[in-house]
UniProtKB/Swiss-Prot annotation:
Gene responsible for this protein: copB
GO biological process: copper ion homeostasis
Protein name: Copper-exporting P-type ATPase B
Sequence repeat start and end residues: 60-71, 73-84, 86-97
Known regulation of activity: Inhibited by vanadate.
Induction of synthesis: By copper and silver.
UniProt similarity note: Belongs to the cation transport ATPase (P-type) (TC 3.A.3) family. Type IB subfamily.
UniProt entry tagged with the keyword Nucleus: no
GO terms under cellular component: plasma membrane
Organism from which the protein derives: Enterococcus hirae (strain ATCC 9790 / DSM 20160 / JCM 8729 / LMG 6399 / NBRC 3181 / NCIMB 6459 / NCDO 1258 / NCTC 12367 / WDCM 00089 / R)
Length: 745
C-alpha cells in the first residue's frame, strides 16, 4: 500500500520532513496534497489566505452530537450489581440485580429468625450459659430453621439453580450445597432423636442459622460496595432535573416534566439551575460549571451561540437555550452507554480470573468430598459433615470473580466523571506498557485556534490600532479561521474596526475594499510580489519558521504592515512533554504543517522526533512503522482527520472532543483539550492495573490458604475452623476485594 512515505528513497522526493535520530521519512507532496492539510479542506476560505502554509492551519470541526438518557437508569444498570454486565460469568447465579433494600430486609428478618435458633440449640453439641431450653424448644428450632433455610437461603438456592442451568457451577452452588447438607442432616438428626430419645444425634441448626445470616450480611456489604464502585455514574444519572421552565410561543413560561421536552424547544435556565438538556444559547451569557459531566474544574464562559451540556450547572446568568439533545439522546446518555459497553468487555486479566474461578468450584468440591471421607474414618459422621460443609462454605470463587469487574466498574466510572471516556476497555490494560506517544500538533499541543502573533508596521504614518481597524474592516464579514482569529484579537483589544464599502474578493489573492475613503487591500505574498511591493525574504522566513501565516496590508497602493497569525502552543504542553519523558515514553509529533514550523514547535517543547507536511494516510504509515519495530503506540489526535492513525495505533485517543464523543476510530475519548488529561488517563490505567493485581492475589491467595484449613489439615495442632468461621472468612474475602476496589481514586 502506498502511503506516500518512502524511507528508502529520500533524494527523489519533495518536502523532506521530520527529524528522527534513527531515520528520516519523506512525503510525496503533490499539488493535491498541498491542498489537503492536517485539518482537512476549508471550503469557504477567502482566497487571499492561500499563501504558503495557510491551508495547513485549518480549523478543527467538531460537529454536533446527540447523546443519551439518564432519567431512566435503574439500579441494576448503574451499580454494576448484575455481574453479567460486568463480564462476570462465574457469578451469574448471584442475583445481584436484586434491589439492595430487599437484600437488607432479608438479612434483618433472617437475623430475627436466627436469634431464637441460636438460643435454643447447642453448637456442635456444646452447651453455653445463654442457651435456653424448654419442652418443645426443639420443635421451635426446627420450624424457625426451616423458615430461615427457605427464606434466608433463597438467594443462594436460586443462584445455584441458575449456575447449574447455565452449566457454570460456582460460589452459589457451593453455598447452596453447604446449607442444604446442614439443613437435611439436621432434619435427619431431629427425626432420629424424636424416634429414639435415648440416643443423641447432633444437629447443625446453630451452624445453619449463623451461616445464612453471616453470608447474607457479607453479600449485603459486598453489594453496597459494588454499588459504590459505580457511584460516580450513579451521580451522573441524578444530574438532570425532574422539571424545566419551557418558553411558549407567546414568550410566557410553563413548568413541564423533563420527559415532555423535545428537540427544538426553548427553555429558560436561571442562575444556579442545572442544565436540563443539551442545547445552544439563544439569549444571555453565563459561566457554567461542567465539572460533574466533563471533569473541567474551571467555570466555562458561555454566550449566544455556545453549546451547553445537560447536567452542568448554570452560574450567575439567566440564559435561554434551544434544545439540541434531550435525556434520551443527550451527552450524558452517550457517556453512560459508552461506559456500560466498556464494563461489558473483558480484559486478559479478567479472562484469567474467570478461568481460575470456574475451576475453583471443582477443586472445592473434590477437597470437600476427600475431607468428608477422611474425617469419616478419623472421627465420626458429624465431624466429617462439618469439614465438608466448611470447605464448601469457605471456598470463594466470588472473590476471584469480583476481583477484576469491581475495579473496572470503579475505574470506568471515575474516568467518565473526569471526561476520560473508554470506548475500548482493553485500552486501560494496554496503557501500562506503552513505548511511544504520537501527538497530532494542532489541537493537542497547540490551541487549534489562530491568533495574531505579530504586527510589523512598515509605514510610520500609521499606528497599530489604526492598522488593526483597517484589517478588521476587511475581515469583519469573512468566516474562515484566520478572519475569526483577527476579529477575536480585535475584540480582546476592544478595538472597533472601520466600516468597509465596495468590498470585493481578489480571486486567489485576497480582499479589497474602500475604507475611510482609501483603497485598502489585504493580500498574500504572491500578490504582493506581483504588485512590485518590497518584501524582506529573511523576515518572511522567520515568521514562517515559527509556524505563522503572513498577510500584507496595502493602503493606497503602499505596503503599510505585515500581520502574522499562528496557532498558539498550549501553556501546559511543555510540562506535559516533560512528564511523558519521565514515564520513559517517547513523544513523537505529527503535523500537516511545513517542516520548519514543525521544528519550531518541537524544539520549544523538547520533542526530538517529529514529522511535518503529513496527510492522514502519512500519519497512519508512520504509526505502522513504529508498530513494525515492536513498539506499543498511543496516537493522540482530533479523532476526525486522524481517524486512520487512531485506528492503527495500539491505543487511539481523541482529544478535545467536547460533546462530540461518538468517534468510532478512538479507543479513548477525552472531552477536554488539556494534554494533562492524557497523563491522568495513564495514571488511572496504572493504578487500575495495580488494584486488579492486588485483588487477584487476594482472591487466589485466600482460597489457597482457606480451603486446606477448612478441610482440617491443621487439626493435629488444634486448629479447626467451624462452618460459621468459614462463612465469616468467605464473606470477608469478598468484602476485602470490594473495599480495595473502592480505594481507587
Amino acid at each position: 500500500m502506498n502511503n506516500g512515505i518512502d524511507p528508502e528513497n529520500e533524494t527523489n522526493k519533495k518536502g523532506a520532513i521530520g527529524k528522527n535520530p534513527e531515520e528520516k521519512i519523506t512525503v510525496e507532496q503533490t499539488n493535491t496534497k498541498n491542498n489537503l492539510q492536517e485539518h482537512g479542506k476549508m471550503e469557504n476560505m477567502d482566497q487571499h489566505h492561500t499563501h504558503g502554509h495557510m491551508e495547513r492551519h485549518q480549523q478543527m470541526d467538531h460537529g454536533h452530537m446527540s447523546g443519551m438518557d439518564h432519567s431512566h437508569m435503574d439500579h441494576e444498570d448503574m451499580s454494576g450489581m448484575n455481574h453479567s454486565h460486568m463480564g462476570h460469568e462465574n457469578m451469574s447465579g448471584m442475583d445481584h440485580s436484586m434491589h439492595m433494600g430487599n437484600f437488607k430486609q432479608k438479612f434483618w428478618l433472617s437475623l430475627i429468625l436466627a436469634i431464637p435458633i441460636i438460643l435454643f440449640s447447642p453448637m456442635m453439641g456444646m452447651s453455653f450459659p445463654f442457651q435456653v431450653t424448654f419442652p418443645g424448644s426443639n420443635w421451635v428450632v426446627l420450624v424457625l430453621a426451616t423458615i430461615l433455610f427457605i427464606y434466608g437461603g433463597q438467594p443462594f438456592l436460586s443462584g445455584a439453580k441458575m449456575e447449574l442451568k447455565q452449566k457454570s457451577p460456582a460460589m452459589m452452588t457451593l453455598i447452596a450445597m453447604g446449607i442444604t447438607v446442614a439443613y437435611v442432616y439436621s432434619v435427619y438428626s431431629f427425626i432420629a432423636n424424636l424416634i429414639n430419645p435415648h440416643t443423641h444425634v447432633m444437629d447443625f441448626f446453630w451452624e445453619l442459622a449463623t451461616l445464612i445470616v453471616i453470608m447474607l450480611l457479607g453479600h449485603w456489604i459486598e453489594m453496597n460496595a459494588v454499588s459504590n464502585a459505580s457511584d460516580a455514574l450513579q451521580k451522573l444519572a441524578e444530574l438532570l432535573p425532574e422539571s424545566v421552565k419551557r418558553l411558549k410561543k407567546d414568550g410566557t413560561e410553563e413548568t413541564v416534566s423533563l420527559k415532555e421536552v423535545h428537540e427544538g424547544d426553548r427553555l429558560i435556565v436561571r442562575a444556579g439551575d442545572k442544565m436540563p438538556t443539551d442545547g445552544t444559547i439563544d439569549k444571555g451569557h453565563t459561566i457554567v460549571d461542567e465539572s460533574a459531566v466533563t471533569g473541567e474544574s474551571k467555570g466555562v464562559k458561555k454566550q449566544v451561540g455556545d453549546s451547553v451540556i445537560g447536567g452542568s450547572i448554570n452560574g450567575d446568568g439567566t440564559i435561554e437555550i434551544t434544545v439540541t439533545g434531550t435525556g434520551e439522546n443527550g451527552y450524558l446518555a452517550k457517556v453512560m452507554e459508552m461506559v456500560r459497553k466498556a464494563q461489558g468487555e473483558k480484559s486478559k486479566l479478567e479472562f484469567l480470573s474467570d478461568k481460575v474461578a470456574k475451576w475453583l468450584f471443582y477443586v472445592a468440591l473434590v477437597v470437600g468430598i476427600i475431607a468428608f471421607i477422611a474425617w469419616l474414618f478419623l472421627a465420626n459422621l458429624p465431624d466429617a459433615l462439618e469439614r465438608m460443609v466448611t470447605v464448601f462454605i469457605i471456598a470463594c470463587p466470588h472473590a476471584l470473580g469480583l476481583a477484576i469487574p469491581l475495579v473496572v466498574a470503579r475505574s470506568t466510572s471515575i474516568a467518565a466523571k473526569n471526561g476520560l471516556l473508554l470506548k475500548n476497555r482493553n485500552a486501560m490494560e494496554q496503557a501500562n506498557d506503552l513505548d511511544v506517544i504520537m501527538l497530532d500538533k494542532t489541537g493537542t499541543l497547540t490551541q487549534g485556534k489562530f491568533t495574531v502573533t505579530g504586527i510589523e508596521i512598515l509605514d510610520e504614518a500609521y499606528q497599530e490600532e489604526e492598522i488593526l481597524k483597517y484589517i478588521g474592516a476587511l475581515e469583519a464579514h469573512a468566516n474562515h479561521p484566520l478572519a475569526i482569529g483577527i476579529m477575536n484579537y480585535l475584540k480582546e483589544k476592544k478595538i472597533t474596526p472601520y466600516q468597509a464599502q465596495e468590498q470585493k474578493n481578489l480571486a486567489g489573492v485576497g480582499l479589497e475594499a474602500t475604507v475611510e475613503d482609501k483603497d485598502v487591500k489585504i493580500i498574500n505574498e504572491k500578490e504582493a510580489k506581483r504588485l512590485g511591493l518590497k518584501i524582506d525574504p529573511e523576515r518572511l522566513k522567520n515568521y514562517e519558521a515559527q509556524g505563522n501565516t503572513v498577510s500584507f496590508l496595502v493602503v493606497s497602493d503602499k505596503l503599510v504592515a505585515v500581520i502574522a497569525l499562528g496557532d498558539v502552543i498550549k501553556p501546559e504542553a511543555k510540562e506535559f512533554i516533560q512528564a511523558i519523558k519521565e514515564k520513559n515514553i517517547i513523544p513523537v509529533m505529527l503535523t500537516g504543517d511545513n517542516p520548519k514550523a514543525a521544528q519550531a514547535v518541537a524544539e520549544y517543547l523538547g520533542i526530538n522526533e517529529y514529522y511535518g507536511g503529513l496527510l492522514p494516510d502519512d500519519k497512519e504509515a508512520i504509526v505502522q512503522r513504529y508498530l513494525d519495530q515492536g513498539k506499543k503506540v498511543i496516537m493522540v489526535g482530533d479523532g476526525i482527520n486522524d481517524a486512520p492513525s487512531l485506528a492503527r495505533a495500539t491505543i487511539g485517543m481523541a482529544i478535545g472532543a467536547g460533546t462530540d464523543i461518538a468517534i468510532d476510530s478512538a479507543d479513548v475519548v477525552l472531552t477536554n483539550s488539556d494534554p494533562k488529561d492524557i497523563l491522568h488517563f495513564l495514571e488511572l490505567a496504572k493504578e487500575t492495573r495495580r488494584k486488579m493485581i492486588q485483588n487477584l492475589w487476594w482472591g487466589a491467595g485466600y482460597n489457597i490458604i482457606a480451603i486446606p484449613l477448612a478441610a482440617g489439615i491443621l487439626a493435629p495442632i488444634g486448629l479447626i475452623l467451624s462452618p460459621a468461621v468459614g462463612a465469616v472468612l468467605m464473606s470477608l474475602s469478598t468484602v476485602v476485594v470490594a473495599l480495595n476496589a473502592l480505594t481507587l481514586k
